Every structure is written in structure tokens, then in C-alpha cells.
């Protein structure tokens, strides 16, 4: 009885091995059919090439494999004793590794991995060399191979100790001292923001900056006659303010919203209001350009009601101050309103302990090197302090104020320029003081490590999604081609893949004619960020693709020119230079370099470049117009030709031009004339007031009295992009 049960068990094992070998053979046959048979398997080659496979050959192969398994099982105890005396090979593995990577780590071929997975629940038919394996299957393969696994450093490092630097807990209220308010001037383009600041700080910034539009963020400390101080931030279209808010930087205490009394509420006015509300910052309304005859401050206040900005005149809490930045009228009232609101907010800070602040701007200065403009929010900054901002650090070499004057200390709410940075941090990054340079490196290394870990997690998610897509595609393919023989199935799959082959270079060039690749270079980090935010609003990809190849801070370099040549792109520079050597190199390579000092001029240039990539549009320009007074027909050969008797009302009719026939305002025919006569004479031009007879190239056209004949010419004009960036 026991022998019969043993035989039955052996038969069941044989049946399982037979099915698994059949699946594995199909995989090997398909791979060998694609790439040619390996000389390492000459016997298999003869068996696999013959189709269909003889049953006795497959059965023999299965029996041979089964005998081998039985022999190994019988020799198990002796084999295990022998293997225990030898050290096991250690294989370094990681999560998400592919079959090919696992085989390479084990120093085996991929077939070895497939065979190790035969007696598992995994669907071998769905696996390819680049398929990613779960942790359980990696362990299964390593165990069956008699090897030891070792997880790579990527997994072990997850328990690494946190070395980051963070802000200190809130200080004891008794230690806090009053500080100056930090005010951001916001509003629509050319509503007078820079001119307003110019009057406050008694400089000529607005006169220097072409067009009166702010070129990049500046931070300025303004001392009022009363002794109070206000720190102003000047933003370029408030794009950088939005970016700072997105990073969680709460720098601004008060927003002064500048609205022109003659223009009223505009698009960027609404955006400014939304930014202030999102940051939960109170607003003071400055109604500018009140010196103009068409100024209407009350209209501005009423328009703002629609955006939940209610001035004190209408029962709200928003102070409204009518001013003229050009003449300086009522500016002190605006300053007093700002100071009064700051007193109500009770702004205080701790001037002691390690420094905390926020990066306002980053740029490269030829004389000073890497420089950041920052607002100090806590502590007192001194020369020699070691700072960390994002993944950058600095040992402060030099500090200077908004006028370039060297200073020894910077207190809370004070804007300061800082040199000594190893790399440039981005606008909005948090600045923290640490005790030493080694500690700064430790913090930066930790933040870079965290970024790598986050990227690794994102990559794993992408891998998992692709794996899921691959599995679904494989399942659909099995449902679609499962009933076919493997050869027919492979041919159909090949034909499908052939349709997805990338375009040839010539075809790609034709397609890329409707693509504009750009490289952006700016003088400071905020300028570049503001331009990038404008480019983010591009919504006309159906007309022309806009691709950002590279962006950075500093003058145009040889690398920028090489990139532009590679991608057939255009270099846009903002407040930067391109040396003679660079310009000569660009000219030889056919690369356009466009330098601007006004941000909206750069955007207009970009719009023109996009428009130049669009196909030309055709416009009709009328030359003359005639009305039909009578209709008749003439006989030419054996057919009757309809003729219209007309009188020219406007311009002139020229036979070589194009014509159209309109009836009740609708065009019913377009084409050319076959005949144009005055009395019985053939003529080429009929002028205003003259009568004529004409026939069309459409024989079946029936004229009606009152129809109009329009003579016109077609002109090709350059199409314009539909993208409206809001300037």
C-alpha cells in the first residue's frame, strides 16, 4: 500500500515537472528563435527547432530531469554534510532588482533564475529579463542556489540617524524685542511699485531700471523721519513671492497693494490679493497715480469689493491711501499707515542665539563671488558665522547693506547681503546658523541623503507602476494571442512593435520644426525663477511645443551655446552679458542669443519667436467690388455659358486676380474669371463706375440680380501665438 502511494506521489511530481518544463522550453525556444541558438545547448537546439515537439522527446527530457531530482533527494544527507564544510557564496541584493541583475550578482545566466522559480506561485510566462522581482522571490532564488544574501547599503541606511538642523523652539516672550515690519509691494505691471519705493529710499532705482519695471527682488531698509524703520521687498510681478510662499517662507508681515487710479483692478492685482490671502498677510491699499486727471480712487475701492478687499470707507479694515508716486504726494501718510498697522500686529523677535532667516535672492557678483540677500528673522548675524540653507552652506566672510556698505552685524527684520557661500541656495530657503563647518557639512550631507532616499522611493513607485502596466499589457496580449501558436504570436507582436519604432532623423526634423527649445540665463536666482513661472503659463502646445532645455544664473557661456546648437534652440538672457568670443561662436553655429533688460520685452520676444514657428495664415485683401444688374447666356461652341452684366461699385476688377460670388452675405463661389468684356472688347481691368460682362470658371453657376462679385488678392501673413502670459 505504501509503495502504491509512493508511486502515485512520484507520478504527480512527474506531471508537475512535465508542465513546468513545457513552459520553460517555450520561453527558451522563443528567446533562441529571436537571437540564435547557443552553442552551449546543442542537444536542446535540435529538439527545439523541430515543431511541433515529439511527445517522446519531451517525455524523455522530463524523465531525465525527474531522475536527476530523485537522485539529488536521495543523496541529500551526504550532500548537505559536504556543503556545510564549504563557505556559502554571499550575494549582494537590493529591493526591486531585475532578473538579469540578480543573475549577474549570482554569476549565473538568466535561465538559472527562471529554473529556480519553477516550483513557485509566480507566473513565469509573464517574466522577462528586465522584470523586477519582489523581496520574497529574490530570497527564494538565493536560497535554492545554496547562497547567502546580503541586502545592499541602500536598505541598511534607512535606519541612519537624523543629522538635520531645525529651527529653535519659540523664545520666552520676556526675551523678545520690537522689530521693524517687513513689507512687500505688490500690484499690476507698471502701476508704479518701483517709483513708490524710489521715493521712500531717496535713490534713483526707478530711473535706472528701464521702463520703470522691477528687474529682480531687492530688499531695502527705509528709515523714516519719525525714527521708525520699514524693510521693503520689491518683487518682479510677484512671481518670486509666490515661489517663496510655496516653500513655506513666512517673510512678509504686510502687503502694500498698489493699484493705479486710472487703470483700476487688473489681472495681476487679483493675483496679488490671492497671494496675500493665502499667506494670511494684512493688506494696505495704495491708490497710485492720483495726480492724473482721469484718476478715480473711489472706482478702485468699489472694484476691490468683488475680491473681498473692503476698505475702511465701506466698513472694512483695509486702510486705503491715495498717493502719487511720481510727485510724492501723501507718501508719508502711507508710511504712517504701515507703521500703525505694524504696531497693532506687535511684531517682535529674539535677537539672541543662533541666527534664523530666509534667502530673498541669490546671485553671482564678479567681485564678491556667490552672494545671497537675506532677511534675518531671529538672532544676530556676525562675520564668521556658519550658515546652512537648503543643501548649501557658508562661512560668512562679508556682510553689506542695500547700499553696498560693509556692516558688522545684522539684526531681525534687517536685509543683508552675505558672501562666503560654497553653493547658491534658492530664493525662499530657510537659513539656520550651526556651530561649526563640520556640522554644516553634516547637515548638508544628511539633506542630500534624504533627497536621494526620496528620489529612490519615487523611482520605486515608478518601477511598480511600470511593472503593473507591463503585467496588464502582458495579460491583454495573452488574451489576444493566447489561442495562436508561438511563431504566429511572435510575428504579430513584432509587427505591432514596428509601428511604435521612433521616427527617423529626417522625419524627426520635420516634426521638430514646430518645437522651440529655449535656454534661460538670468542675473539672479529670482529673475530666473520669475521667467520660469511665466513660461509655466504656456498653454499653446497645440500650436508649437515650448521646451526648456536649460536655465541658470550668470552670463551666457560656451556650454549654453553648445546646448542651443544641439537642440536647435534660442538663448534668452536677462540682465546678463555674452562676451565677444561667445557671440562669435554662436554666430558660427547659427545660434540666436537674445539679451534683454526688461522682463516683458523678453516675453514679447519669446512670443514673436513662437509665432515665427507657426505656419503662415492667408488673408484676403479686396481689390474691387461689382453688383450684378442683369443675367444672360452666350453660346460658345455647343454649350451655353452664363454671363453676368455688372457695374463696378468700388475699386477695380482685375482679371488675373481671384474672385468670389456672394449672395445675401454668403460666399457661394470662389475661383477665376474665364472672360471679362467691356461691350464686345476683352479687357483686363474694369474701373469704378464702368459696366462689364463676365463669366466664371464654373459653368453651372446661376447668377441672380443683386449678387455681388468681389475681386481680391491673397496675402500670407505671419500667424501669432495664442499664448497670453498676462503682460
Curated annotation (Swiss-Prot):
Monomer. GO terms for molecular function: GTP binding; GTPase activity; ribosomal small subunit binding; RNA binding; translation factor activity, RNA binding; translation initiation factor activity. GO terms for biological process: mitochondrial translational initiation; regulation of translational initiation; ribosome disassembly. Residues 324-326 are annotated as: G5. The keyword GTP-binding applies. This is Translation initiation factor IF-2, mitochondrial. Keywords: GTP-binding, Initiation factor, Mitochondrion, Nucleotide-binding, Phosphoprotein, Protein biosynthesis, Transit peptide. It comes from Homo sapiens (Human). Residues 234-237 are annotated as: G3. Residues 178-348 form the tr-type G domain. Residues 187-194 are annotated as: G1. It is found in: Mitochondrion. Expressed in all tissues examined. Highest level in skeletal muscle. It holds the Pfam family IF-2. CDD domains: IF2_eIF5B, IF2_mtIF2_II, mtIF2_IVc. One of the essential components for the initiation of protein synthesis. Protects formylmethionyl-tRNA from spontaneous hydrolysis and promotes its binding to the 30S ribosomal subunits. Also involved in the hydrolysis of GTP during the formation of the 70S ribosomal complex. GO terms for cellular component: cytoplasm; mitochondrion; nucleoplasm.
Amino acid at each position: 500500500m505504501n509503495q502504491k502511494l509512493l508511486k502515485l506521489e512520484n507520478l504527480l511530481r512527474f506531471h508537475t515537472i512535465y508542465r513546468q518544463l513545457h513552459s520553460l522550453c517555450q520561453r527558451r525556444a522563443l528567446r533562441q528563435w529571436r537571437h540564435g541558438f547557443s552553442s552551449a545547448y546543442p542537444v536542446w537546439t535540435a529538439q527545439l527547432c523541430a515543431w511541433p515537439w515529439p511527445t517522446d522527446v519531451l517525455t524523455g527530457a522530463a524523465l531525465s530531469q525527474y531522475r536527476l531530482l530523485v537522485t539529488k533527494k536521495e543523496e541529500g544527507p551526504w550532500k548537505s554534510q559536504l556543503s556545510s564544510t564549504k563557505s556559502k557564496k554571499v550575494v549582494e541584493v537590493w529591493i526591486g532588482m531585475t532578473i538579469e541583475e540578480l543573475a549577474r550578482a549570482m554569476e549565473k545566466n538568466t535561465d538559472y533564475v527562471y529554473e529556480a522559480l519553477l516550483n513557485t506561485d509566480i507566473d513565469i510566462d509573464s517574466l522577462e529579463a528586465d522584470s523586477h522581482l519582489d523581496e520574497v522571490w529574490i530570497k527564494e532564488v538565493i536560497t535554492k542556489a545554496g547562497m547567502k544574501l546580503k541586502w545592499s547599503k541602500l536598505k541598511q541606511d534607512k535606519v541612519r540617524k537624523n543629522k538635520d538642523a531645525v529651527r529653535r523652539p519659540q523664545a520666552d516672550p520676556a526675551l523678545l524685542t520690537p522689530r521693524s515690519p517687513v513689507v512687500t509691494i505688490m500690484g499690476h505691471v507698471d502701476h508704479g511699485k518701483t517709483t513708490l519705493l524710489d521715493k521712500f529710499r531717496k535713490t534713483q532705482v526707478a530711473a535706472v531700471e528701464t521702463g520703470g519695471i522691477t528687474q529682480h527682488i531687492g530688499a531695502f531698509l527705509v528709515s523714516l523721519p519719525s525714527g521708525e524703520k520699514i524693510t521693503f521687498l520689491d518683487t518682479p510681478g510677484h512671481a518670486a513671492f509666490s515661489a517663496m510662499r510655496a516653500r513655506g517662507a513666512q517673510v512678509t508681515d504686510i502687503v502694500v497693494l498698489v493699484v493705479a487710479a486710472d487703470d483700476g483692478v487688473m489681472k495681476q492685482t487679483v493675483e496679488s490679493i490671492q497671494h496675500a490671502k493665502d499667506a494670511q498677510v494684512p493688506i494696505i491699499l495704495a491708490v497710485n497715480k492720483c495726480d492724473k486727471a482721469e484718476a478715480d480712487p473711489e472706482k478702485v475701492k468699489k472694484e476691490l469689493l468683488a475680491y473681498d478687499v473692503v476698505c475702511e470707507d465701506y466698513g472694512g479694515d483695509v486702510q486705503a491711501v491715495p498717493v502719487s508716486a511720481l510727485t510724492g504726494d501723501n507718501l508719508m501718510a502711507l508710511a504712517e499707515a504701515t507703521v500703525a498697522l505694524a504696531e497693532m500686529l506687535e511684531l517682535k523677535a529674539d535677537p539672541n542665539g543662533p541666527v534664523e532667516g530666509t534667502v530673498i535672492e541669490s546671485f553671482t557678483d564678479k567681485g564678491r563671488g556667490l552672494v545671497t540677500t537675506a532677511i534675518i528673522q531671529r538672532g544676530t548675524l556676525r562675520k564668521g558665522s556658519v550658515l546652512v540653507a537648503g543643501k548649501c552652506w557658508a562661512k560668512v566672510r562679508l556682510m553689506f547693506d542695500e547700499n553696498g556698505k560693509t556692516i558688522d552685524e545684522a539684526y531681525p527684520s534687517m536685509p543683508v547681503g552675505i558672501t562666503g557661500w560654497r553653493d547658491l541656495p534658492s530664493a525662499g530657503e530657510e537659513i539656520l546658523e550651526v556651530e561649526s563647518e563640520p556640522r554644516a557639512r553634516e547637515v548638508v550631507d544628511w539633506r542630500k541623503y534624504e533627497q536621494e532616499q526620496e528620489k529612490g522611493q519615487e523611482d520605486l513607485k515608478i518601477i511598480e507602476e511600470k511593472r503593473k502596466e507591463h503585467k496588464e499589457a502582458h495579460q491583454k496580449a495573452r488574451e489576444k494571442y493566447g489561442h495562436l501558436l508561438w511563431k504566429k504570436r511572435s510575428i504579430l507582436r513584432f509587427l505591432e512593435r514596428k509601428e511604435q519604432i521612433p521616427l527617423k532623423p529626417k522625419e524627426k526634423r520635420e516634426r521638430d520644426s514646430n518645437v522651440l527649445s529655449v535656454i534661460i540665463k538670468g542675473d539672479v536666482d529670482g529673475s530666473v525663477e520669475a521667467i520660469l513661472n511665466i513660461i509655466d503659463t504656456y498653454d499653446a502646445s497645440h500650436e508649437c511645443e515650448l521646451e526648456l532645455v536649460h536655465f541658470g544664473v550668470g552670463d551666457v557661456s560656451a556650454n549654453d551655446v553648445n546646448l542651443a546648437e544641439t537642440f536647435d534652440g534660442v538663448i534668452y538672457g536677462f540682465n546678463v552679458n555674452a562676451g565677444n568670443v561667445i557671440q562669435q561662436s554662436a554666430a558660427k553655429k547659427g545660434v540666436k542669443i537674445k539679451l534683454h533688460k526688461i522682463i516683458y520685452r523678453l516675453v514679447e520676444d519669446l512670443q514673436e519667436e513662437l509665432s515665427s514657428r507657426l505656419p503662415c495664415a492667408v488673408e484676403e485683401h479686396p481689390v474691387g467690388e461689382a453688383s450684378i444688374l442683369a443675367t444672360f447666356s452666350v453660346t460658345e461652341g455647343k454649350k451655353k455659358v452664363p454671363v453676368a452684366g455688372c457695374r463696378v461699385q468700388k475699386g477695380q476688377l482685375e482679371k488675373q486676380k481671384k474672385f468670389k460670388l456672394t449672395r445675401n452675405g454668403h460666399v457661394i463661389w470662389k475661383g477665376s474669371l474665364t472672360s471679362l468684356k467691356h461691350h464686345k472688347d476683352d479687357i483686363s481691368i474694369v474701373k469704378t463706375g464702368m459696366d462689364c460682362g463676365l463669366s466664371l470658371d464654373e459653368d453651372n453657376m446661376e447668377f441672380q440680380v443683386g449678387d455681388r462679385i468681389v475681386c481680391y488678392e491673397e496675402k500670407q501673413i505671419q500667424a501669432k501665438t495664442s499664448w497670453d502670459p498676462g503682460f
